[in-house]
Amino acid sequence: MNLTRNFLLAIVILLTVSPAYATVYQYFDEEGTLIVTDNPFGTKKPTPRPDIAYPDIKLRYRDDVSYDFYPVTGNNFVELISSTNLNGPLDPADRKKYAGQTKWNTGWSYAFNSSYTIDGTYMYVSLNILDIEFMSDISVLLPVLQDRTTLSNYDLILWDHFVQKLLEHEHDHVKIVKDPVYKDEAVKKISAIKQLRLAYNPGDNLDTLIKGAVESETLRIGHDLIMKIKQQNEEYDRITDHGLQAEMSAAFFGN
């Protein structure tokens, strides 16, 4: 009887508390691929090309977005649109060029503490994930005139209107990325991670093992989240024909 009792005590280690909190940083590109880890500053924000200045028109910029510009030239509005079609950014999804482009990375940081029970070859982990914070880096690429002096006032009015409508379309993509519904869903799923069962090896560093397992769980959540955002962006471009049918924007957002 005592031998059996001692044997059971040898294979079951009762509750052990992890000695410290752990902090995780995860950032994802538009394909849901992990691009930065253990970096409290997130991804590096893009900076505008030094040889390209902000357009000499009043556009409604956002403080939470970075802007970059590519040059276009022409003697009238039609030539400017042709230059935009020639020099605009390439969409890797359909290999077509468009007048504007929104690029984004998003992710989060969170802290967690843990306790665990080891039973034979398995470790049963109890988790408390907290302090979940979201971060995103969003950049918008727009065309900018190299020389406004060669254009008539009428062509300038047409061009300025075109760029403003283009910016509004790209800002709708920003709106999709920043929709709080995705943040709320992710927080709910991350916070729901309360228990893990992990294979245990006596030679393992338990803190490293637990942290890696938690990161794997939230990595899956992050990938699924990015895929939903990407799908919404693609659907928005489909419905609005990449901004050519701007009147469909209100229907998409339910306004």
Label the model's feature ranges.
Residues E30, T43, H171, E247-N255:
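Post-signal/leader-peptide non-cytosolic segments of secretory proteins
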